[in-house]
Amino acid sequence: DIPSLPEAADLAVVAVPASDVIASIAALGERGVRTAVIFSSGFGETGPDGKALEARLREVARASGIVLCGPNCLGFVNAFDNLYATFSQYAEGDVGAGPVAFVTQSGAFGTATAALIRQRGLGLGYFISTGNEADLSFSELMTAVVEDPRIKVAAGYLEGLHDGEALVRLALRCHALGKPLVLAKVGRRAAGQKAAASHTGALAVEDTVLDAVLRQYGVLRARNEENMLDMLEALSQPRVAEGNGLGIATMSGGAGVMMADRAEELGLT
């Protein structure tokens, strides 16, 4: 019973059937709530009817003065301030805050990656599952968290882009702040793009175009989960290597040759 709330909450967590979400958001707006996380699925990821419902949700939220995370998301965590707006298993085990911010378009993949980041002892300051991004986009959410001085490196999992220009602005802001941005972008081929669209309603983008944009603006692209974890571990250290100089020390001549070949491919000398 939203109207009977004793005062307006700072944040609403909405977990009701999709058919009831819009009415809930309207009622929250009337009560003075200004931010909401929507866990409910059944929107743009389901097809034309779901897209229409999501568009209506966006309209009502904006008319009500509410900013949204989601729908179809797993919420977010601000470990610095002990805020856990999620129903995922993220909060199990050691949840100490750290210098890494991780924003993901996949809730399940994101929570698994977050667990691996924490297993390496890196520490997550922020974890955000964006869902369908009916309102706040991946780039907007990431831009907000990189402004926190406690964050030293930002990482993200992308299935599609809703706003390429916003991603460029994010990259420029990270560069200005001196904070590396590491992205894992899936959907390189048609099958992956189709799967992403059915998952979170993600929009496909030509992979070669995205690669060129990321290189132009200094964004590091992770090939896979393990590659991302290695990058984050290196970049979150107190001292980060500068330049492209590389020394290789190995007991195996063959391994040294392989590493030398790979180093040259990556532009290391």
State where each predicted segment sits.
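Catalytic-core regions of core metabolic enzymes
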Residues: D1-T269
